[in-house]
């Protein structure tokens, strides 16, 4: 891997955003990958396994650079790259500056479930009294107010839909690791510097 040469902000963690983040990280940039959704992969995350081979939907979308299939790598596993920081439920509010030196202002929704402590056991979802249409399955099934947004989520933790949650606290009581905390801060706003050292 090359020496770090600057930083980059990739807005949108769909398939093209993920691929861009991985390419920039391999070039040596420190990458902030943000998405306003609570999960990665965009629409492609709904195509978890594809017929007829059951290959991963994300990996099937990779361009084949060489004839040797080993030139491809798993997009999900690649996101654990040391140069990539993932910020979900985050949106770009403002962008100021000039080429090579930008200041980005980001706003992040509160995290009710701590992804570092959530084990993905599903106990919380089992006691949630709220049921709503599941967007992941195009409204054909139901989900709870606390739910796993997509299979193989990165990080593999549950999220709370504050628009439908009644704040009853049942999930917080049953969580075996204490990962759920409804005493959240309001939306956090912060600024990051996006720099290309070669242009400065």
Language model features with spans:
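Conserved S-adenosyl-L-methionine
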Residues: 26-30
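Beta1/beta-strand and adjacent pyrophosphate-binding region of the FAD-binding site
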Residues: 2-16, 32, 193
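Gly/Ala-rich phosphate-binding loop of Rossmann-like dinucleotide-binding domains
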Residues: 21, 25
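Non-heme iron-sulfur electron-transfer modules
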Residues: 6, 37-73, 87-117, 129-167, ...
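Acidic-histidine catalytic/liganding microenvironments
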Residues: 81
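Short glycine/serine/threonine-rich phosphate/pyrophosphate-binding segments
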Residues: 17-20, 170-173
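Glycine-rich Rossmann-fold phosphate-binding loop(s) that bind the pyrophosphate
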Residues: 12-16, 121, 168, 197
């Amino acid at each position: 891997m090359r020496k770090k040469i600057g930083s980059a902000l990739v807005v949108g963690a769909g398939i093209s955003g993920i691929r861009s983040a991985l390419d920039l990280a391999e070039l040596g940039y420190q990458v902030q990958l943000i998405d306003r959704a609570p999960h990665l992969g965009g629409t492609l995350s709904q195509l978890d396994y594809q017929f007829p081979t059951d290959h991963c939907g994300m990996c099937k979308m990779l361009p084949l650079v060489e004839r040797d299939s080993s030139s491809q790598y798993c997009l999900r596993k690649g996101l654990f790259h040391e140069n990539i920081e993932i910020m979900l439920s985050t949106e770009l509010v403002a962008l100021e500056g000039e080429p090579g030196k930008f200041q980005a202002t980001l706003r992040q929704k509160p995290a009710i479930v701590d992804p570092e402590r959530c084990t993905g056991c599903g106990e919380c979802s089992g006691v949630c009294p709220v049921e709503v249409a599941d967007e992941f399955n195009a409204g054909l099934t139901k989900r709870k107010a606390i739910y796993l947004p997509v299979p193989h989520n990165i990080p593999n933790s549950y999220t709370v839909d504050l628009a439908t949650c009644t704040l009853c606290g049942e999930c917080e009581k049953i969580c075996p690791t204490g990962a759920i905390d409804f005493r959240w801060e309001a939306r956090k706003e912060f600024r990051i510097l996006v720099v290309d050292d070669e242009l400065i």
